[in-house]
Amino acid sequence: MIINLQQLTALLPLLIIMLTVITVILSISYNRNHFFVAVFSILGLIFALCSLYFLIEIIPINVSILFHFNSNAILYIGMILISSICTCIFSYPWLLKYPFNKEEFYLLVIISTLGAISLTISHHMASFFINIELISLPMFGLIAYSRYQKYSLESSLKYIILSGVSSSFLLFGIAWVYSISGGLDFLSIHKSFNFASEKEILVVLFGISMILLSLFFKLSIVPFHLWTPDIYQGSPTSVLSFFSTAGKISVFSVLLNFLSYFSNSDNKVIYFILSLIIILSILVGNLMALFQKDIKRFLGYTSISQIGYLLIVLLVSHKNYSFSLEASAIYLCGYLFSNIACLGIVNLISTSHINNNASSINSYRGLFWSHPLLSSVLTLVLISSAGIPMTLGFIGKFYILSIVMIEHLWLIGFAFLIGSLLGLYCYLRIILNLYLHPSKLFKRDLNIPLNWVYTPSGIVICISGIILLALGIYPNPLIGLIKCTI
């Protein structure tokens, strides 16, 4: 296969990341230098992000039968790269205290980023499966990186086993679909679904159901969510900022791309499965979050409901497909910056703790009285996650609710309302905890530096908070940008 100049330009972000991976490997082999590897990794990801500018004029474009670049893919790739950059920035102060090899952490993040970007542009089941694994395999190491902590290895082992089961379902589904379609690209599967006989359609539907089951596991939605709180609790906080954003954004992107070939509103089986999973995810995620005393487990359960809201865009008819792309992009922008800021603050507090662990919600009691700016940013982030007006989170939820109204999804709308009320109570419980007077029963062994706002992590946290507030008050620049790309 001959690749022309335009196709080579389209691959520029991937080529830059590959070059970064090779350089980091050589640096580790010859001379370990934590600072150099960290800076070079961040610069490589920034250059990859900037290279997306050169793709704007050449899209849409196919690179072989495996990859398809369009404006929507560029938007998701940008989100993934922002998440990866923030993860490397958050990880540096934590790794300074890490007693074992530090440089491999950045290598695993970059390799997983490579898989996430490749998955976003996948247009074929071969690249789809390979890139799912390319995301997951480094993630095993990242989750277990803090191996001296109590739950780290346990969480990694759980994720390895369950991820293996998920991959087996994915391969099983691909095999069933291929038996009828005779091809592995998404268009061939679409054609087999439309022109197959009644018996063959049942086989294709079963295969698609297995594929969706695997993706639902990666998105950690009900009923494939039971592993989520344990993984969140056992993983290093800086890893969670990557796991909960880049990993899920890439999987959602390929899910949206795959299902775009099928009219979910016309197919009753897929429509029913999606509707049931969405309702359960919204309600169960928020309901379980009510009873959590660990901040990481709390964020794990709320992530289930947040992805549940997002999946509503999959239920639109073809005539409203472009609006669903706009709604999902706006919602994901709010989701991305909320998670970056929230987990950045949790990481900052945890690394400042005497035991490098401040996961208990009680650790945050009265934080406002000692660190008012940090508490204010955390309050803003939680308010945005709850979907309160004047924040980007509200704009995202408003667009999702618009889809509910346009498509007349009244049962899902009722679940949306109940879930939002439960979520509001969950977030307000933590917000109020920040402004209570510090309890004498719970000693907070925190040593947060007074100049935290001038550190790289602090700058990222503050910028994320400003974005959530500014785009919540005046969202037109973001909406205009997304409309131009879609």
UniProtKB/Swiss-Prot annotation:
Enzyme class label: translocase
Membrane-related topology note: Multi-pass membrane protein
Keyword Ion transport recorded: no
GO cellular component: plasma membrane
UniProt keyword annotation of Transport present: yes
GO BP term (any one): ATP synthesis coupled electron transport
Coiled-coil residue windows: none
Gene Ontology MF terms: NADH dehydrogenase (ubiquinone) activity; NADH:ubiquinone reductase (non-electrogenic) activity; quinone binding
Catalytic activity reported: a quinone + NADH + 5 H(+)(in) = a quinol + NAD(+) + 4 H(+)(out)
Record's function text: NDH-1 shuttles electrons from NADH, via FMN and iron-sulfur (Fe-S) centers, to quinones in the respiratory chain. The immediate electron acceptor for the enzyme in this species is believed to be ubiquinone. Couples the redox reaction to proton translocation (for every two electrons transferred, four hydrogen ions are translocated across the cytoplasmic membrane), and thus conserves the redox energy in a proton gradient.
Subunit: NDH-1 is composed of 13 different subunits. Subunits NuoA, H, J, K, L, M, N constitute the membrane sector of the complex.
NCBIfam families documented for this protein: NDH_I_N
PANTHER family: NADH DEHYDROGENASE
Identification of the protein by name: NADH-quinone oxidoreductase subunit N
Organism, scientific name: Buchnera aphidicola subsp. Acyrthosiphon pisum (strain APS) (Acyrthosiphon pisum symbiotic bacterium)
Upper classification of the organism: Bacteria, Pseudomonadati, Pseudomonadota, Gammaproteobacteria, Enterobacterales
Gene that produces this protein: nuoN
